């Protein structure tokens, strides 16, 4: 792309920050709000679902989901997300970002409501219905990853691009807090309206019939914020970079951007800016071409592997916070509480950890990513996560002893803080900045799907890996013997350390245009 062809894209890169940028953050971020809300809430309500559907008459302890059912409920949404990331990433490059953007949000709205309406004559059929709708919910959420990241990167100016993409991702923080607030609020209402004794006092009465409505209402509420932004998402124009570079309609690109951004672009300037009307010395290369491998092969290896390793560590802990809290004594023993009391205590504990550790990390990234840079934040985040996991694992017996649990929780919260002020944010941001426009959503989708493979490994593997190595103790929970929580933390520390090393494959996009990073601005390059 010759220098005089860069006029329009340079105008977008240098455009001042304005109100539409913030509007786009909210519109694009609703998918991540729903993603985090669903992930947070499903880890809460699985305990309640176990009590409602799997408590046997005469049992000495409250019911819980069988291992295979728990793995399916927790993991099926990840399988859907992975599939959606690959499909909608490819489709976003094929037919345009805007063309499919509304489809993902509509899927989230419908399937969030449908998850709460899961039906069946037996517990197995209810769980099968829930898993079906959670797969398609994940499919819609997955599509939002490459589309939202790509749209925000192509709207933003290069000076604050990292902060804008990070802010979209940081909507997960609001989703987490909303999940906690909704769960606490609904549970508090039902507890006061339908008081129940602890399981130890009266097993049957400890789970009132109305508890079956609680988990359904919590899951369904996730559809509301997405529904409120659907209209505005459908009104968003296609990005200028896609329209001019990929769709070859420079005049439309100029008109669209002039409507929403305070950038004056004439049709003549847009035509000059479109690289499609100029001869190139080489043909456009595809994803599986040798030219792509030469230019971006190591980049793709870096973005996929670091996201994979981050999500193994992140989701292994995030999905099962409630079990860790119970193990260290932060949540009372299940049989000393009613079903709604247990949900209330778990929701309160997880919300406190999110408020103190998880959510602030997102906004530290927003504030500092365009100052410090992506590479430094990601490398430092992986390194500090490794250190904190080792600090949890080495003296694990000390942390689980009576009186020391608060120290464990503080280190645990700091681990999440540096995950979010670190690789959890940067692995999402960088793939939207370093690949060519015609492959940008596809490559982001591939990177994100790799991350979800890690989440699947974490969500399925941690159920078994963290079980006690003593067969009798593991069997009491319905699992085969594992390696224990302590050794699992050592394994997760190893994943974080490897992520730190592989970060060196990822380039630094701070302060550079998208065309500079993808090398689309080079003379003779497509």
UniProtKB/Swiss-Prot annotation:
Keywords recorded for this protein, A-Z: Membrane, Phosphate transport, Symport, Transmembrane, Transmembrane helix, Transport
Broad class of where this protein is predominantly found: membrane
Residues in compartment: Cytoplasmic: 1-24, 92-99, 144-163, 233-296, 373-374, 431-445, 510-526
Localization per Swiss-Prot or TrEMBL: Membrane
InterPro entries for this protein: MFS_dom, MFS_sugar_transport-like, MFS_trans_sf, Phos_permease
GO CC terms: membrane
GO biological process per UniProt: phosphate ion transport
Pfam families, per the entry: Sugar_tr (PF00083)
Transmembrane stretches, start-end: 25-45, 71-91, 100-120, 123-143, 164-184, 212-232, 297-315, 352-372, 375-395, 408-430, 446-466, 489-509
Disulfide-bonded cysteines: none
GO molecular function: phosphate transmembrane transporter activity; symporter activity
Membrane topology (Extracellular): 46-70, 121-122, 185-211, 316-351, 396-407, 467-488
Entry superkingdom: Eukaryota
Magnesium recorded as keyword: no
Topology relative to the membrane: Multi-pass membrane protein
Induction statement: In roots by phosphate starvation.
Function: High-affinity transporter for external inorganic phosphate.
Note: Although related to the sugar transporter family, it does not transport sugars.
Family: Belongs to the major facilitator superfamily. Phosphate:H(+) symporter (TC 2.A.1.9) family.
Protein name: Probable inorganic phosphate transporter 1-7
Organism the protein comes from: Oryza sativa subsp. japonica (Rice)
Gene from which the chain derives: PHT1-7
